[in-house]
Amino acid sequence: VACNPHRVGFLGLLVTLGIVFGDIGTSPLYVMKAILHTGETISESTILGALSCIIWTLTLQTTIKYVCVALRADNNGEGGILALYALLRKMKRKWIYILAIIGASTLLADGIITPAITVTTAIEGLESISPHLPVIPITLAIITIIFFVQRFGTESIGKSFGVFMLIWFLLLGVTGAFSITSYPLILKAFNPYYAAMLLARSPEWFLILGAVFLCTTGAEALYSDLGHCGRKNIAISWGFVKTMLILNYLGQGAWVLNHADTALAVNPFFAIMPQSMLFFAIIMATGAAIVASQALISGTFSILSEAMNLHFWPRMRIKHPTHVKGQLYIPMINLAMYIGVVLIILLFRDSSHMEAAYGLAITITMLMTTLLLGFYLHSKGVARIFTMLFMGAYCTIEAIFLTANLSKFLAGGWCTMLIGGILFLMMYVWVRAMKIRRHYISTKPLNDYYQIISDIKADESIPKYASNLVYVNHASKEGTVDDKLLYSIINKQPKRADHYWLINMEFVDTPDTLEYSCETLIPDTLYSVTMHIGFRIEPRVSLYLRQVVEDLVASRKVDLKSTYPSLRKNGIPGDFRFIIIHRVYYPERSDNRQQNLLMSIYAIISKIGIDEPKALGLDTSMVVVERVPLIISQRTGSIRRIARIEE
């Protein structure tokens, strides 16, 4: 369901609850349980210290960093680490893209573990009712349904997410507040003194912080979903959500101190529920886990869609299952995520083991966001002292959390780091390979060929290839053209047409830009159309060109009626044919081993993408693909004639 990011009202706040807070809203299911399993002795000082860490982590990380600072670093209303990078990519620091792809890779890796841990923890609540219920099969069944329905879109059920999450957060707050009454001294946890004392005296402080960090793993989603809901809706909703979360954490802490002897045997989240409400709480927890999973899956699709337009990821088939703006479905990614989540569940078996795999990857994402935010603040002329204080404080905090989470590496953190590492390698190779490809594309000044193109059009001895011939021009410099494009028109097979169209695509730093400019290079013959496409917009060239042509015809800047008398008599327009110059990389030995390795990996990665006509949204019945070799070897040589010996 859509949310107007520019308006604040009850409906907008309700929708925001359903879209933004699923991940962070399910953290109470496992955070306290994870803290109890660090091995630290259960005592008042331990629980007060841990709760104080939770409260101040939510305050420093989520409230101050994300709500107060990051939400203001928007790219025309859009947020997220890639939207932030798009604002900065014109900076002189060319290496800054590495921060963006590290952050995006680890964020995507986190999206694999979140559905697994949230759904598993919710279903484990059934063990308190019936200890012999098969948790894993039920969890796998729910996960299968979640991923299966993605192809149909979630517009119909999405409308209820906001109402559901409102009930969920009220359940968290009310049950937590009721439990607090049994141990009112738990409110001392608001004093950061207890957090400092716990971390100072406990030899297991890094394990405790690793568990505490799980309370804020969903904070990055607040920033990523900025474009869906708007800063004010998120900020106001967060005030309510944070209150409910803290009440629940305090309630769980109160229960633990009242039941210190048995606390390790059960999940405190379900333990604070009245027995009569336990089954209802399990149903609600399962529903909240589904909402959180849905948000992560949708977020993954959005991130990869942005990555494609930023040339971080190969083009893949994207579907739009509903009419809701921004709702995407990428079949191959959906399948890959499903397989990944299932393997995580089968590998770790229960939520306690999954907790070890959770948190490490997202810590790195947050650290990368902090660094990019620092560059953003500097680019906006924010006082240097404030920028340095912000970066220093949050780099220190997140480095401490990273150190704490590294302690979980062997116990399970390796899993998300492996996934994140593979994704980073793919993105890094793709970026470098695209730069290499552009480097070896030879271009020529277009105006040197105006006369010969005009002559080809006028030469009736050449069979007409099409009425309108369209090329995608990959030359980056204005006024130049890909030499293989000229070779296609002039040398390979002279192509006579009534009109030649050169399409230049410029992916801009703003998210939703969709504009064009058209220049007539040869009157009534050659046109150059530049499409300015935002990083959230799909490059559907056929559709956009049709709109461009309709505009030009309506303004009488071009006459596209067929030149065939019988067709022109009936007002039928000329046909269009697209020519795609596809460069195929052929591995060759060269002295640059690093470049050879990059291009070899690139050739493998490119197999998961779709071909260029589909990537550009072209009608394949109107497309001719001309393949040419991409030669990156610097070696040159000449063939030597062998002397012929006459007998």
What are these regions (language model features)?
Residues V1-E647:
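The structured alpha-helical core of multi-pass membrane proteins
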